[in-house]
Curated annotation (Swiss-Prot):
Name of protein: Uroporphyrinogen decarboxylase
Main location: cytoplasm
Annotated signal peptide: none
Catalytic activity line of the entry: uroporphyrinogen III + 4 H(+) = coproporphyrinogen III + 4 CO2
Pfam families: URO-D (PF01208)
Residues carrying the site annotation Transition state stabilizer: D93
Gene: hemE
C-alpha cells in the first residue's frame, strides 16, 4: 500500500529512527525498556484548561481548528512548552476523519459531536466511503511541521476506536446508555458488522496518515467501550480492534489502547494487540498489571479530579500510582482520563516536575 511505503521511507530517513527520539523516556517506557525517569503526558493536555488555548480558539469552531495546520501545530505545542511533558499528542478530534469523508456532523460546545442523520441501517452504512490521505492534507502538513519542531520529543497520533465512533454515528451524539447502539449490535448483526468494518478501515487509514507524516506512537481511544460486558466486547468489538492493531504492526511504532470504565476489559484490551494499555483511575495499576497479558506496558492512572485537592493529596496519590506501577513491565504516567477543563495548569506543571524528580535514576 502506498501509505505503508511512505511510512517506511520516513523511518528509513530518520524521522522515526532518530537515535535521540528512540531514546526518549516515553518511547522506551512504551517498549518496556529502562528509563531515566517515568515519562509523563496527559490526555487533553492541549485544551480548555490552558488560557493560551482558550485565547487562540476564540471564535474558531473546533472542527475548523482541527483543519488548520497553523492552529494544530500551535495548540499541540502549548502544553509541551508549559509543562515539559515527555510527549506531545496531535491536536485533533476523533470525529475528524468522519467529517473528512462527508458525514454531516458538528462538535457543539458543551454537548460534543452531533450527527445530523444517525446511521441505523445497511443503506446508510454503505454510504460511508473510505478515507484517503488527500481527505486530510492538513494532518500531514501539521504533523510534518510538529516533528521538525519537537525534535527528540515524540509525537503521539491518535484515532477513535470503532465502537466509540459507531456509538456517535448511531446515537447521533453523546449517549449515557448507548441504547440505540446496543440495539443495533444485538438486533441487526449484519449492519453492525458492515459498520464496524468500515469504521475500522477509516480509523486505520487515519492512523497510517499520521505515522507516514512522522508520528512516533499512536493511541486508539475507544472511550465508550466500557459500556460493554466482556462477552459483548469479545464478540462485537475485539475482532475489529485486533485487526487495526495487527495492520499497524508493520510500522514498528508503539500502539496504545485506552477506554474509560474498562477495568473488566483490560485483559481483552491487551489481547487486541496493543503494546501499552491505558488504565482509568478505577483500577490500581498493580491489579491492572495482573489483568493484561505479558509484555504489556501500562499508562495512567491518577484520577483527574484529584488535581483539585490540596497539593499534599496530589503528591500522596501520585506516589501511590508510582508505587503500584512498579508491578508493570513499563509505565507511562498519565491521568485516568482527560484533563478537566477547569484544572489549574500550575498543578499540572508541578505534577510533571514531581514525577520526574521522584522517579529520576
Amino acid at each position: 500500500m502506498i501509505l505503508g511505503h511512505a511510512a517506511r521511507s520516513l523511518r528509513e530517513h530518520g524521522t522515526i529512527r532518530s537515535v535521540t527520539l528512540q531514546d526518549s523516556a516515553f518511547l522506551r517506557a512504551c517498549r518496556r525498556q529502562p528509563v531515566p525517569h517515568t515519562p509523563v503526558w496527559f490526555m487533553r493536555q492541549a485544551g480548555r484548561s490552558l488560557p493560551e488555548y482558550r485565547k487562540l480558539r476564540e471564535g474558531v469552531p473546533m472542527l475548523e481548528a482541527c483543519a488548520r495546520p497553523d492552529m494544530i501545530v500551535e495548540i499541540t505545542l502549548q502544553p509541551v512548552r508549559r509543562y515539559n511533558v515527555d510527549a506531545a499528542i496531535f491536536f485533533s478530534d476523533i470525529m475528524v476523519p468522519l467529517k473528512a469523508i462527508g458525514v454531516d456532523l458538528d462538535i457543539k460546545p458543551g454537548v460534543g459531536p452531533v450527527v445530523a442523520e444517525p446511521i441505523r441501517d445497511l443503506a446508510a452504512t454503505r454510504r460511508l466511503r473510505g478515507l484517503e490521505p488527500d481527505d486530510v492534507p492538513y494532518v500531514t502538513e501539521a504533523i510534518r511541521e510538529l516533528v521538525r519542531e519537537l525534535g527528540s520529543r515524540p509525537l503521539i497520533g491518535f484515532a477513535g476506536g470503532p465502537f466509540t465512533l459507531a456509538s456517535y454515528l448511531i446515537e447521533g451524539g453523546p449517549s449515557r446508555h448507548h441504547e440505540h447502539t446496543k440495539a443495533l449490535m444485538y438486533g441487526a448483526p449484519e449492519v453492525w458488522t458492515e459498520l464496524m468494518r468500515r469504521l475500522s478501515a477509516i480509523t486505520l487509514e487515519f492512523l497510517r496518515v499520521q505515522i507516514a507524516a512522522g508520528a512516533s506512537a499512536v493511541q486508539l481511544f475507544d472511550s465508550w467501550v466500557g459500556a460493554l460486558s466482556a462477552e459483548d466486547y469479545r464478540a462485537n468489538v475485539l475482532p475489529y480492534s485486533s485487526w487495526i492493531f495487527a495492520q499497524l504492526a508493520e510500522f514498528d511504532v508503539p500502539r496504545i489502547h485506552f477506554g474509560v470504565g474498562t477495568g473488566e476489559l483490560l485483559g481483552l484490551l491487551s489481547e487486541a494487540g496493543a503494546d501499552v494499555v491505558g488504565v482509568d483511575w478505577r483500577v490500581p495499576l498493580d491489579q491492572a498489571a495482573r489483568r493484561v497479558r505479558p509484555h504489556t506496558a501500562l499508562q495512567g492512572n491518577l484520577d483527574p479530579a484529584v488535581l483539585f485537592a490540596p497539593w499534599s493529596v496530589v503528591a500522596e496519590r501520585t506516589d501511590d500510582v508510582l508505587a503500584r506501577a512498579k508491578a508493570a513491565e513499563g509505565h507511562v504516567f498519565n491521568l485516568g482520563h482527560g484533563v478537566l477543563p477547569t484544572t489549574d495548569p500550575a498543578v499540572l506543571e508541578r505534577l510533571v516536575e514531581y514525577v520526574h524528580t521522584q522517579t529520576a535514576n
